[in-house]
């Protein structure tokens, strides 16, 4: 169905380009895919790859009927990839192809006859058209124009201007269904946030010469990993799959060595990549493997927990544990892309989902106060629903906070320390409780503790403390702690990485939304602990 007013519709993936020879389908398709950050495929390329011979050789060996059957299969395969697709000019002559495009967004690039003749006359690889471009194009237009009009979602006119202008017009009409949050710095990348993000978003971030990927995941995610692998294999990639023990047990040198062996077995090259599917333990471990194999290859993070989406998977930190402590072995290795598909959250245990909100609330206090306003103005039932629009906005905003901070300070030399708001005490609670407390639960207590320290320092008011208590409570997180003694907690705090020359250093707020690091005396910390009933 043709749409007369382009501005009245929104396009979505998969996105198919059709048109006569010379219309610019492949060039515009590549430009659009690059701007959207997804894969592009030309069905003629798929046909040649699967057949192992050129299009002209297929016509010689199998005649047009054999080629069209291959083309039908290629179109179905391309549509399943969910990216940008450029069809051969005659593909729509097959009824099966037209049927496959019924529910797909199809852009018909229409070019006036004289301009089309000018274009194809310059193309040395079109011998048939070169003999009589005017007559042949008139014939093709008569035969195919009704078929293009049958399948088109929208028709765009192309003149003698650059293909980039047509591509820009298409991109303006596309609704990806997900948001891209940019992380800047020396190694920039995007975080894609939304539902049902297709495999084309993974491929769009890989190097153009990548041919192999190693998927690393925890055992409970074997089905999800297989789904991703199937999609990548459909697109021609060699895929290896490796599991690791769930949780912190997977962050060991033995596990990493086994993953290195798998990378070696696959002969992963510099152009290839590791894909991490899982929570923070997976992104930490797989990221370290990617950072160290061949001194660094590509990494795609697909976090499946809320905590990993808003924290571990974004920022470029990788690491494993040792007998000396957690995350002491690692390096900074930014990913090529992060795919935060919110569909994964629907199967996340409720306690893990709630704990992940701890980092979200923290981001509201240190940087984006709109997060707090959303939490304060949203029904608590919606705050516990992973599919609510409010949760999606909260996640997007929390990721944007981290992206903004990491863009300015990847290696935690200054600004990035503000992301540790609430973490000094939180890490101590986690360790003293043998990690039976979830990270986000401990962060809630740690932020309330830090807010009280802010009052002692004259940086915050009692009302600001109450706002902390209310925000963390509304999402279901604890705001008090009555476990081990404060002396035991203090011993752990004194070993915190932020301690300098025996001085405690806490991230505090000088007003909501304005975080910085302060030196705190043990007496000040004890005063607050006593006030909160931590003996």
PLM regions with names:
Residues 374, 378-487:
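Active-site segments that bind and position negatively charged phosphate/pyrophosphate groups
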Residues 42-100, 125-126, 134:
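ATP-dependent small-molecule kinase phosphotransfer cores
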Residues 57, 103-147:
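A glycine- and Lys/Arg-enriched "phosphate-lid" helix/loop adjacent to the NTP-binding pocket
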Residues 25:
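Conserved lysine of the Walker
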Residues 2-10, 31, 35, 143-182:
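NTP-dependent small-molecule kinase module
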Residues 352, 358-361, 459-535:
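C-terminal charged capping/lid subdomain of soluble metabolic enzymes
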Residues 177-273:
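ATP/NTP phosphate-donor binding region
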